[in-house]
Amino acid sequence: ALASALVYGLGLEFGLIIGGILLLVSGFFDMVDGQVARATGKTSQNGSYLDSMFDKIAEVAIFLGLLVGGYAEPYLVMLAIALSLLVSYARAKSDALNIKLQGVGIGERAERLLVIAIIGIIGYMEPAVIIVVVIAGITLVQRMIVTAKNIKEKTE
């Protein structure tokens, strides 16, 4: 993912294609690494924590690469970063309240990065960022509603 962020940031002639392919490949390995850890019995709280932190760092780096590469308006990129982090925070805070939000919302991290990779590859990065803003915003609201509903049910 960091390699795709670098490619996007350099603004290379085929940067959207190369960056998108790198993003798809890194997404595949990100998906597989957790499954391998579970299958081999090598999961740990530290590994889970570091995986989540590096996922967020990589996601922000990708958006910053798009910003530096000039692929989308700065305000859209910043909004995408803010909403993406808020979606993750909403889940983390709900988890701390013993409310599970995995799978809640139409725009989890994998979906957001898939939009960036695929729509970016075909040459429409700014619309891809707009789609990310919309689905991240919807996901944030969905998670807030589900969390509020669960809190209300627990206190009744």
What are these regions (language model features)?
Residues 1-46, 74-79, 124-135:
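Membrane-embedded alpha-helical segments that form the functional core of polytopic membrane enzymes
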